[in-house]
């Protein structure tokens, strides 16, 4: 949730999102931790501009590792897809990591509204991918949070059909972890035996 603008001086709720994004990148570099993959869980742009996605790509280029992404409610997928692909960032939604794990990225965007929902296509795709790799553990990524965040304003914009997702995942106990964005705060919950994590935004 970087919420970048085409113009680097623009602010969101008083925060310059380009500067805060750069500060987070600098902090990561300063820690000097190994990094194998960057996963961007949506709301990369606030203004849906191609330039905002280019700014995101420029920021992560210094890590020299692959990046995968999924859309959030603020993103405009045509600009997101073309701009990130031009920057060499893969649109892949299934990533194998070694022999034991896979990462699957779901699109929960309902364009034009803040809440999320997984389409029948997404749920069918997920079930097909999980069934094809029964021996792999799975990390599942999506933008919208499937469990309440404890904030009534945020929770009205959550994943609307989390029960349908839970029904699919119940068949596949090797789905160990889920990671979402959207709520701009840390979350670490148990969801029917799966670990559900959310991370703060780089801005507000």
Where is each model-derived feature located?
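Active-site glycine-centered loops adjacent to acidic/histidine catalytic or metal-binding residues
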Residues: 1, 42-43, 72, 143, ...
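Active-site-proximal beta-strand elements of phosphoester/diester hydrolases
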Residues: 1-6, 100-110, 139-142, 194-200
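N-terminal active-site segment of His-dependent metallophosphoesterases
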Residues: 1-55, 59, 149
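Acidic/histidine-rich helix-loop elements
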Residues: 3-20, 46, 76-89, 111-120
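Alpha-helical scaffolding within the catalytic cores
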Residues: 23-24, 54, 79-94, 124-127, ...
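His/acidic metal-ligating clusters that form di-metal
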Residues: 24-37, 115-195
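Metal-dependent catalytic neighborhoods of phosphoester/phosphodiester hydrolases
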Residues: 40-61, 76-89, 151-153, 187-192
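A short, structured active-site edge motif that brings together acidic residues
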Residues: 67-77
């Amino acid at each position: 949730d970087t919420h970048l603008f085409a113009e680097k001086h623009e602010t969101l709720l008083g925060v310059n999102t380009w500067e805060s994004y750069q500060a987070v990148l600098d902090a990561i570099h300063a820690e000097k931790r190994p990094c194998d993959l960057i996963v961007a869980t949506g709301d990369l742009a606030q203004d849906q501009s191609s330039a905002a996605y280019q700014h995101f790509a420029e920021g992560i280029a210094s890590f020299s590792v692959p990046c995968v992404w999924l859309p959030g409610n603020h993103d405009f997928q045509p600009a997101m897809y073309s701009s990130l692909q031009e920057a060499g960032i893969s649109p892949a939604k299934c990533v194998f990591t070694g022999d034991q794990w896979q990462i699957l990225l779901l699109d929960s965007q309902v364009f034009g509204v803040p809440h999320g929902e997984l389409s029948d296509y997404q749920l069918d795709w997920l079930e097909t991918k999980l069934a094809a790799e029964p021996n792999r553990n799975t990390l599942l990524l999506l933008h919208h949070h499937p469990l309440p965040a404890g904030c009534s304003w945020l929770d009205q914009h959550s994943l609307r059909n989390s029960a349908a997702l839970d029904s699919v995942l119940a068949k596949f106990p090797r789905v160990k972890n889920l990671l979402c964005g959207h709520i701009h705060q840390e979350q670490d919950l148990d969801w029917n035996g799966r670990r559900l994590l959310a991370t703060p935004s780089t801005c507000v």
